[in-house]
Curated annotation (Swiss-Prot):
This is Podocin. Disulfide bonds: none annotated. It is linked to Nephrotic syndrome 2: A form of nephrotic syndrome, a renal disease clinically characterized by severe proteinuria, resulting in complications such as hypoalbuminemia, hyperlipidemia and edema. Kidney biopsies show non-specific histologic changes such as focal segmental glomerulosclerosis and diffuse mesangial proliferation. The disorder is resistant to steroid treatment and progresses to end-stage renal failure in the first or second decades. Some patients show later onset of the disorder. Interacts with nephrin/NPHS1 and KIRREL1. Interacts directly with CD2AP. Interacts with DDN. Residues 103-123 dip into the membrane without crossing it. Belongs to the band 7/mec-2 family. Keywords: Cell membrane, Disease variant, Endoplasmic reticulum, Glycoprotein, Lipoprotein, Membrane, Palmitate.
C-alpha cells in the first residue's frame, strides 16, 4: 500500500511539472514583486501547468486595469482609458539614438567647449523658471529623459536647440459657432476653455498649433454633445453640459500632453425669429398667470363680502355703524358734495321682506306740493 501511494504521488508530481514547494515559492515571489509577473507574462491557459513555450515571444509590458471598474465609474473610466492610450505615443517619441557622424560632432563640440572653458560656459548654460520646462533637440533628435527645469541646464550651442513650454494655466476663448439642438433649433454659442501643458516632450512632438487644435476640438465636441439636448436643457443645465464636455475633451487632449481643467459656456445667441416666438410664448404664459391670480383674488374678495354680509345681517347695530362710517368717508373724500341722509328706519322698512311683498312705499309725486307733517294753525279772524 505504501509503495502504491508513493508511486501515485510521483506520478502526480510528474504530470504537474512542479512540486508544491516550488508553487509556494513562486506565489511568494509574485506577491513580493507587486504583480510584476502579471504585467510581463501573458495570461496562463486554464488547462496547462506551464506559463508558455520558450519559442513564443513575450508580451510587451502594459498597465493592468479592471475593465468592470472602468465601465462602472463613468467619467473616471473614460479618463483612465484615455490615459492608457496616451502611453503609446509617448513611447513612440523616444529617440532612436545618434549615429557615428553625429557622435563625432558631439565629441568635437565638447572638446571645443573644454578648450575655451572660461568663456564658453556662458553660452552653454541657461536658466529655466519654475513654471517652465525645456525640451532639447540634438541634431534633430529628441534627447531621452524628462524635460529640463526648473533651474540651470546644459546644452551644446552648435548642435542643440531648445524649446521652452509654459506650464501655467492657459485661457482660450472659443468664438461663436452654430449648433443644432435635439428639437431642431439652430443657435450659436461661445465658450471659454482652461487648459495646461502636462507633457512638454509629447506636446512638441504631437502638435504644431496648440490653440487651433484645442479650439477646433472644443467646437466639434460641443456640437456633438448639444445635438442630444433640447433648447430648454441647454439654457438650464449649463453646469452638467460643461462637465460632460470637460471629460470628453480630456480623453482626447491627454494624448497630446494637455490637461483640460475647465470649460464654461459663456453665452447663447438665438436667431431673431426664435427670440420673437419665445417672447410671445412667454408673454402669453405671463398673461395667463395674471388672469388666474386676478380670478383667485376676486373669488377671495366675494367670499369675504359674503361672510361680512352674513355677520351684518345678524347684528343691526353693526349695520348702523357701517352706514355712519360710509357717510363720514363720503364727507371727507368729497367735501363739495352735499349728502342728505335718510332715516335709518325708512331704510329698514324698504329692506324688510314684508315691504318687498307688498310693494314699495308710496312716495309723493314731485308735481304736487308736499304738505308738512305738522301744519301751522291759522290765526283766527279776531286776531
Amino acid at each position: 500500500m505504501e509503495r502504491r501511494a508513493r508511486s501515485s504521488s510521483r506520478e502526480s508530481r510528474g504530470r504537474g511539472g512542479r512540486t508544491p514547494h516550488k508553487e509556494n515559492k513562486r506565489a511568494k515571489a509574485e506577491r513580493s514583486g507587486g504583480g510584476r509577473g502579471r504585467q510581463e507574462a501573458g495570461p496562463e491557459p486554464s488547462g496547462s501547468g506551464r506559463a508558455g513555450t520558450p519559442g513564443e515571444p513575450r508580451a510587451p509590458a502594459a498597465t493592468v486595469v479592471d475593465v468592470d471598474e472602468v465601465r462602472g465609474s463613468g467619467e473616471e473610466g473614460t479618463e483612465v482609458v484615455a490615459l492608457l492610450e496616451s502611453e503609446r505615443p509617448e513611447e513612440g517619441t523616444k529617440s532612436s539614438g545618434l549615429g557615428a557622424c553625429e557622435w563625432l560632432l558631439v565629441l568635437i563640440s565638447l572638446l571645443f567647449i573644454i578648450m575655451t572653458f572660461p568663456f564658453s560656459i556662458w553660452f552653454c548654460v541657461k536658466v529655466v523658471q519654475e513654471y517652465e520646462r525645456v525640451i532639447i533637440f540634438r541634431l534633430g533628435h529628441l534627447l531621452p529623459g524628462r524635460a529640463k527645469g526648473p533651474g540651470l541646464f546644459f546644452f551644446l550651442p552648435c548642435l542643440d536647440t531648445y524649446h521652452k513650454v509654459d506650464l501655467r494655466l492657459q485661457t482660450l476663448e472659443i468664438p461663436f459657432h452654430e449648433i443644432v439642438t435635439k428639437d431642431m433649433f439652430i443657435m450659436e454659442i461661445d465658450a471659454i476653455c482652461y487648459y495646461r501643458m502636462e507633457n512638454a516632450s509629447l506636446l512638441l512632438s504631437s502638435l504644431a498649433h496648440v490653440s487651433k487644435a484645442v479650439q477646433f476640438l472644443v467646437q466639434t465636441t460641443m456640437k456633438r454633445l448639444l445635438a442630444h439636448r433640447s433648447l430648454t436643457e441647454i439654457l438650464l443645465e449649463r453646469k452638467s453640459i460643461a462637465q460632460d464636455a470637460k471629460v470628453a475633451l480630456d480623453s482626447v487632449t491627454c494624448i497630446w500632453g494637455i490637461k483640460v481643467e475647465r470649460i464654461e459656456i459663456k453665452d447663447v445667441r438665438l436667431p431673431a425669429g426664435l427670440q420673437h416666438s419665445l417672447a410671445v410664448e412667454a408673454e402669453a404664459q405671463r398673461q395667463a398667470k395674471v388672469r388666474m391670480i386676478a380670478a383667485e383674488a376676486e373669488k377671495a374678495a366675494s367670499e369675504s363680502l359674503r361672510m361680512a354680509a352674513e355677520i351684518l345681517s345678524g347684528t343691526p347695530a353693526a349695520v348702523q355703524l357701517r352706514y355712519l362710517h360710509t357717510l363720514q368717508s363720503l364727507s371727507t373724500e368729497k367735501p363739495s358734495t352735499v349728502v342728505l341722509p335718510l332715516p335709518f328706519d325708512l331704510l329698514n322698512c324698504l329692506s324688510s321682506p314684508s315691504n318687498r311683498t307688498q310693494g314699495s312705499l308710496p312716495f309723493p309725486s314731485p308735481s304736487k306740493p308736499v304738505e308738512p307733517l305738522n301744519p301751522k294753525k291759522k290765526d283766527s279772524p279776531m286776531l
